[in-house]
Amino acid sequence: MTSLNDIRSTFLDYFGRQGHAVVPSSPLVPRNDPTLMFVNSGMVQFKNLFTGVEKRDYVRATSSQKCVRAGGKHNDLDNVGYTARHHTFFEMLGNFSFGDYFKEDAIRYAWELITKDFGLDKARLYVTVYHTDDEAFEIWKKVGVPEDRIIRIATSDNFWQMGPTGPCGPCTEIFYDHGEHIWGGPPGSAEEDGDRFIEIWNIVFMQNEQFADGTMVPLDMQSIDTGMGLERIGALLQGSHDNYDTDTMRALMEASAHASSTDLDGDQNVHHRVIADHLRSTSFLIADGVMPSNDGRGYVLRRIMRRAMRHAHLLGAKDPLMYRLVPALVSQMGQAYSELGQAQALITETLKLEEERFRQTLDRGLKLLDDEVAKLPEDGNLPGAAAFKLYDTYGFPLDLTQDALREQGRTVDTDGFDAAMAEQKAKARAAWSGSGDAADATIWFDIAEKNGVTEFLGYDTEVAEGQVLALVVDGARVDKVASNQDVIFVTNQTPFYAESGGQVGDSGTIRTETGVLHVTETRKVAGVFLHVGQVTEGTIKVGQGASLSVDHERRRYICANHSATHLLNEALRWAIGDSVVQRGSLNSRDRLRFDFSHNKPMTADELAQVEAEVNDLITRNTAVETRVMTPDDARALGAQALFGEKYGDEVRVVSMGHHAGSGKGLDKDTYSIELCGGTHVKRTGDIGPFVILSESASAAGVRRIEALTNQTASFYLSEQNERMGQLAAELNTQAADVLDRVKALKDDRKKLENEVAQLRRELAMAGGTSAPEAASVNGVNFHAQALSGVTGKDLAGIVDEHKARLGSGAVLLIADAGGKAAVAAGVTEDLTDRLSAVDLVRAAVAELGGKGGGGRPDFAQGGGKDAANAEAAIAAAKTVIEGV
């Protein structure tokens, strides 16, 4: 049987032989496209090539693209597990031409691949063309498809548009006939929705540009975009019409069945299908840098996770299940996607943690859903308010509730749910509103196309000469700028580092023969460095020569923080394990911030170990080395990379420190090796002192460390030392003895507090108001007393002393705490079978302006707003005793 891995390789190898660049899949998180939640097709990473705003060193490409469809317009989540071809995660095989070949070659390549390399029966293949696309019709005839199997389609199914305006063009699709034993008709027929004729490949001919008025003109650059789902063609080549019968999906489902000790087929099958699919999407999303959260992409990830976890619950799994399936996934797909193996520890830890948390509420949430359903008529649907309560209180996404109700033939009032969710949706929309930059990205692409990308000189120098290529004010290009104008300044080369990889951009000064620019920040778009600042003297014109000078002191501090971050990252891995993965960072002038995956607070000992190890590496003052190499060579050395980052053919590798047990580097003794494009110190000693300020939660499963280095750390330590001296003087001791002195003071205070409490109890036992002596009520010795000068905390001990004195009986005490009442009651063990202290407290509290009260039959506590009603409260408690 041909495996999915073999099919993927066959596809890519075929187009590689046809001169296509084999381009790796992009991460699932789109770059520079805030309108798209996840990559959902093969063309996404090539979008700027199709629109002409970007150029690369190839004009034809092929890829197997990771895709997720679980939100927004393309949302397959509800159907996953119940149909043969719906997935949240799938791979899209594609070949692309950017102004190179067009219809004839695209059709010829497709036909040759599927009939020769894949060996599909030509007699079972049908094709569709757009009804006016005579050219495609004739090409299909030319390659050998009979006219009666070339179907003209007049609907939008065979006409592709990027949007209301922009590139568009007709499509041609290839269908496979599974045979008469399966219901359905050919495309365009009344029975086309059946499963007999299945589309396996879509080929888009981008040949026109559409304008807002509906007119179309031919594109100057005509292109090809194709897509073929790997799972769909895999099912066909493996003799099935169900994607879940493919070898990869079957292996994951078998792993699910084994881990849950359940049958693979029968009633359990749908659960295993959901788990297998969702395992792929969640694992790849985590590997590409998405973590579960309550908004944005992280919320979609959490929804997918929790849907799978509910199906694991329905299988009867008593313990977390998903994380135990990760090795099976890595075994199936890790060779094609190395990021799975690299992120395996993080994926495993994240899945386990999320499932442990969700299982704590799942049973309660499902019980609440059952209670709500029990109130409904036989064919009633769940009100939106109830569904929102599940979401708001128990973290149940709407689709999880819908999924649970689906099995009962019920639905949810989604309009009611949407109304309850309006505020959250508004916040979510605001979060996706984009960066708000005045200048459209096309400006920078135009500059890059005309002048090339900016050459960065800042690894070797902080001063350089350049030429002014562009000036941008309020989103528009201008020829010159005058004093006090804010401007974005572009040169052909620069020593200024542009913000990226967690490192802030440089600031400094740029001078021309006629003016001076103060640079406050440096950014980068499409390889163009943007110097953002204000003209402080004279005027500056496009075409002038420029002298660029980076703020040396600021850069020095930033470099120290960035290099320290590398050492911190590795020290954390040594201290708490390989599950530590960088989740974010900020390296600024003043401090560094490092976010990392970890599911609990670090201990004081762990933090001390990390801080000491980083400082030890700093004091060794070893050289910081940088080399440029291929990503594969870097990984072979053990270099750490950021999950979700896409790297080019060459990467910059930063190495520092030595550790005999590291196993990394050429000599297997390098402490830290990371792929990094930032600027760093020359030697570790240049970092200076390293001080951890804090460790805290940043998000679920993510911790954050903030730290100082260099002179900032020295100032901090000096300030702390000064404060310690002041504290020692205040305590009349030496700095080294401050801790012992504080402990002694705390012990003295505790002793005095105990003595005061004992005195209050003795005073309370000796007097007070309202029946200082016990009275017999219904045969029960009852001591009731309103006290002053005691606190609520004192009452428990006083109640116990009165119970001991009575031997058999009940006690009620009310303390006046600044006008409010603290109440405590006790009943001796011999009476608790017929009298409860809880009932006494509740009766008393009701008279004191309070509610409730609780505890055990032998002791209970409560409180009220008005201690002045103590007499009425005692009388109410007495009534309770009289009634037993």
From Swiss-Prot:
PANTHER family reported in the protein's UniProt record? ALANINE--TRNA LIGASE, CYTOPLASMIC, ALANYL-TRNA SYNTHETASE
Cellular component terms (Gene Ontology): cytosol
- CDD domains named among the record's database cross-references: AlaRS_core
Free-text cofactor note: Binds 1 zinc ion per subunit.
What are the names of the required cofactors?
Zn(2+)
Principal subcellular localization: cytoplasm
- Which annotated residues bind Zn(2+)? H562, H566, C676, H680
Q: Name one GO biological process term.
A: negative regulation of DNA-templated transcription
GO MF terms here are: alanine-tRNA ligase activity; aminoacyl-tRNA deacylase activity; ATP binding; tRNA binding; zinc ion binding
What single Pfam family name could you report for this chain, choosing any that match?
DHHA1
What keywords appear on the UniProt entry?
Aminoacyl-tRNA synthetase, ATP-binding, Cytoplasm, Ligase, Metal-binding, Nucleotide-binding, Protein biosynthesis, RNA-binding, tRNA-binding, Zinc
Copy the domain comment: Consists of three domains; the N-terminal catalytic domain, the editing domain and the C-terminal C-Ala domain. The editing domain removes incorrectly charged amino acids, while the C-Ala domain, along with tRNA(Ala), serves as a bridge to cooperatively bring together the editing and aminoacylation centers thus stimulating deacylation of misacylated tRNAs.
EC id: 6.1.1.7
What InterPro entries would the database entry show? aa-tRNA-synth_II/BPL/LPL (IPR045864), Ala-tRNA-lgiase_IIc (IPR002318), Ala-tRNA-ligase_IIc_anticod-bd (IPR018162), Ala-tRNA-synth_IIc_core (IPR018165), Ala-tRNA-synth_IIc_N (IPR018164), Ala-tRNA_ligase (IPR050058), Ala_tRNA_ligase_euk/bac (IPR023033), DHHA1_dom (IPR003156)
Protein name as annotated:
Alanine--tRNA ligase
Compartments where located? Cytoplasm
Enzyme class per UniProt? ligase
Q: Which HAMAP family match?
A: Ala_tRNA_synth_B
Q: Which PROSITE patterns does UniProt cross-reference here?
A: AA_TRNA_LIGASE_II_ALA (PS50860)
Catalytic activity reported: tRNA(Ala) + L-alanine + ATP = L-alanyl-tRNA(Ala) + AMP + diphosphate
According to its UniProt entry, what is the function of this protein? Catalyzes the attachment of alanine to tRNA(Ala) in a two-step reaction: alanine is first activated by ATP to form Ala-AMP and then transferred to the acceptor end of tRNA(Ala). Also edits incorrectly charged Ser-tRNA(Ala) and Gly-tRNA(Ala) via its editing domain.
- Assigned protein family: Belongs to the class-II aminoacyl-tRNA synthetase family.
Matches recorded under NCBIfam families: alaS
Please name the taxonomic classification of the source: Bacteria, Pseudomonadati, Pseudomonadota, Alphaproteobacteria, Rhodobacterales
